[in-house]
Amino acid sequence: MTGSLIMLRVHKRKFLVRTTTSIAAAALLLGGIAISTTSATAASPSAIAKGIALAKSRLAEYTKLPTFTAPGAPFNARKIMKNKVIFSIPVNSSDQFVQTLENGMAAVAKKIGYKFIDYQNSGSPAQWVAGMEEAISEHVSLIDLLSGINPATLAPQIKAAKAAGIKVVSSDTYGIGQPSDPILNGTVNAPYGETARLQADWMTVHSNGKGHILLIGSSDVAASPFGIAAEQSEFKQVCPACKVYTIDVPVADWASETQTQVQAQLQAHPNLDYVSPVYDSQSQFIIPAITTANKIGKVHIVSYDGTPFVLGDMQTEKGSIVQMDVGEDLEWVSLAIADNEMRIVGGLPAVANEEIPLYLWDAANVNNAGRPPQNNKGYGAAELTGYYKLWGLTK
């Protein structure tokens, strides 16, 4: 894996621990795993209750099926995209998450009537360079760098594309509000900060404001510091009595290090209530650690992505291990990417937030995702009507 070259955002990857806390933070290094600790403060019962109430109020919105909020002004998509071409270079075509987004973007292109090229590759930077060169030679309208390609690794090619009048956009890589590479013409950002805050809110409520929590970041992912900082900040606000430990296991080390490190943390901190990886696919290496420690029903997993196999674990275990997972409709994400990129192609103002909604999956509603769970199932279909109307489509 080329972790140093890729800003990963896919179903088997994602966050970092470089944050410091305003309370008391201790950092050390054990076996190459960075560890930080946020100590609980002496919070009064009223402060704890206030935090729980605030967390509950923030969670409530995300227990309802998503509704559509227009991210920007309406426009005539077919007029703007006539004779236009979008060339998408995904981080790795073999990843199910990435290919689902590509398929959704291709469906939008077919509906609107413009050409969409999905540049298949296996995650090699050399292939990304070749894709950029092909896009430039074909004089496309916009190049989409999807789901984690670091723009810095393609700086010469991006400059050449822009010199040729081609716009270059990074999609589903940066979090909303996170600074992006200025070499880009635009971005389509993901709600990474909000997902992190929701995880903190959930663990606050379900630990009665006194949780002992292990966060797991992955330092080879660009959005990691952003998400971890958001989660730490939320705990400080809603759970002053919580004790939060944070370790870093790079994606490249997930298979070899996660179980060992989680087992070590369970032994070092026997009162742990939650293990919370920023990306839910890491749970496949966490569940064995919880099982080996005989902590099923005592230590739960809370995470983000709504990955089908993780929701399947939730169904099988009835929430006894994976308790909650923040999900997003990948069809909605595809439509959001297409929306902002069409705006950029047409010279319209880009939108900073595509209003991609989130939805909380738990044991009470997870069967709505299908048995077995499927991408895009259980979220409703408000996005199709909403975006089609926004784009001036009558049929």
Feature roles, as predicted:
Residues 71-72, 116-139, 247-268, 283-285:
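Structural motif
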Residues 128, 186-213, 225-226, 258-259, ...:
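Hydrophobic alpha-helical segments within soluble ligand-binding/sensing domains
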Residues 139-148, 167-171, 214-215, 246-247, ...:
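Periplasmic-binding protein-like
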Residues 147-162, 231, 250-313:
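Hydrophobic alpha-helical
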Residues 151-152, 156-194, 212, 307-319:
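Flexible loop/hinge segments that line or gate small-molecule binding clefts
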